[in-house]
Structures are given as C-alpha cells and as structure tokens.
C-alpha cells in the first residue's frame, strides 16, 4: 500500500520514470549505507530520539536468501525496570509499549532524569529536562559546574553548590551509562545469535543517531559495554 501511494505521489510530481523497489526504515538504511564501505556490516542501529536495530540474517530455513530483519528492539519488554521507569511508562501515551525505548532513547532520558531529580531534591513537581539538557550537564566540569548550576536554577529555582552539581552530573551519567549498556546488550545478543556454536566473526556495527553522535560519553560507554559483555570477542567488532 505504501509503495503504491509513493508511486502515485511521484507521478503527480511528474516523476513517472522512477519505480520504488522497496520501502525501508532508517535502521535498515543505516545498515545498507554502511555496507557499501564496510562489507562485513551485520548490524544497523538507530540510537537517537528513538531506538531500533536490524541485522542481516543468513541462516533462514527452506533456502530463503539472506534477509535484513527489522527487530523493533525498542519494544523489547523482558527487562528489569525500576520504579522511575514504571512511573514514566504509566504516564506515557502508550503504557506498556516500547519499554526498552523508554529506558534508553533521547526522547525519554531527560524525563527519567527529571523524575529522579525531583525525588532527590524533594521537589513538589517534576522539573522539565531534555536529553539536550543532560548533554550540557555531562559536558560541564569541575570545580565550579557553572552550566549545571545555571540550568538547575532555571529548571528548579534552587541554587546548588558545586558538590550538589557534581552529584547531579553523576545522576545524568548513570542514566546515560545504563542506556548505553542496555542498547549494547541487544547488539551482543545479535552477535551471539549469528555466531551460533562457532566463533564470533569479524563484523561491523553501523550506529547512527543524535544520542550516539552528540551526547557526551555515549560512544565510549557503548564500546566499554561491548568489551564488558563480549570479552576478547569484542576485538572482532567495530
């Protein structure tokens, strides 16, 4: 249906000589684009406002040709959420859905940060924070934490000491680290699935998105998690 609608729209624009062959999402596009330069790319992932991952599956039954599997991994639900995760989920537009995405993505990390901070500071209402705010806090440094102090003053009306700001930065980092490790765990699961009973093959993971590209410490924590989970096999993955 989508292909037909796209084809009709192209014709209306006078572009009748283009025939759409396939409709793909951004996750699959990341894998395919990376595979042009890195033929051993097996996993494509979006780590941004939302989260999803796909992978190239070769071991399909009945002689079916290799196929890219879109996992919709943001909807994974066999997790161990904490009470802040549950509070965020219950207040969301679709409670019970996209549980992993609500624990890892840029859309929700700032909200989680605000929920925890409200309890930590004993605030009467949850302050509004975004992942951009978290990035600013993570970029801020000792000894003064000036940007963090200014941001917290704006959002909460409270003037914090440098020690308080250091604790707030630690909270932001903890939320980011958990996000990166959960996302990386999904990659490790795919890698182990593809390896089966054999050794982990040399392969490339293509990751795109605002959290991975722009949030401080995101890339470093994904890489660290790969080594923590895969051990020596992580040397086969880049």
Q: Across the structure, where does each feature detected by a protein language model lie?
A:
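Glycine-rich phosphate-binding loop and adjoining helix at the ATP-binding site
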Residues: 1-35, 41-43, 63-80, 219-221
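ATP-binding/phosphotransfer module of carbohydrate and carboxylate kinases, centering on a glycine-rich
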Residues: 11, 35-38, 43, 85-238
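Short His-Asn-centered micro-motif
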Residues: 24-27, 47, 208-209
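Short beta-strand scaffold segments in enzyme catalytic cores
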Residues: 29-33, 44-46, 51-57
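Structural beta-strand/beta-sheet cores of well-ordered domains, especially the beta-sheet scaffolds
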Residues: 41-45, 49-51, 67, 203
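Short, glycine-/Ser/Thr-/acidic-enriched flexible segments
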Residues: 50-51, 60, 76, 114, ...
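Acidic, glycine-rich loop-and-beta core segments that form the ion-binding/anion-interacting portion
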Residues: 56, 60-103
């Amino acid at each position: 249906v989508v292909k037909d609608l796209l084809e009709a729209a192209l014709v209306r624009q006078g572009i009748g000589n283009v025939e759409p062959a396939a409709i793909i999402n951004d996750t699959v596009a990341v894998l395919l684009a990376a595979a042009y330069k890195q033929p051993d790319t097996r996993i494509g992932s979006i780590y941004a406002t939302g989260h999803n991952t796909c992978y190239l599956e070769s071991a399909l039954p009945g002689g079916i040709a290799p196929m890219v599997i879109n996992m919709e991994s943001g909807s994974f639900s066999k997790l161990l959420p904490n009470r802040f995760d549950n509070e965020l989920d219950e207040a969301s537009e679709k409670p019970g859905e996209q549980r992993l995405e609500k624990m890892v993505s840029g859309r929700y990390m700032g909200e989680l940060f605000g929920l925890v901070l409200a309890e930590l500071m004993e605030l009467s209402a949850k302050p509004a924070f975004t992942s951009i705010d978290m990035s600013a806090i993570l970029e801020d440094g000792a000894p003064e934490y000036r940007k963090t102090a200014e941001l917290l003053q704006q959002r909460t009306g409270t003037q914090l000491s440098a020690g308080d700001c250091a604790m707030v930065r630690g909270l932001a980092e903890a939320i980011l680290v958990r996000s990166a490790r959960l996302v990386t765990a999904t990659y490790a699961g795919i890698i182990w699935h593809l390896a089966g009973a054999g050794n982990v093959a040399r392969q490339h993971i293509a990751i795109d998105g605002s959290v991975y590209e722009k949030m401080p410490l995101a890339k470093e924590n994904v890489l660290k998690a790969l080594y923590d989970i895969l051990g020596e096999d992580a040397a086969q993955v880049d």
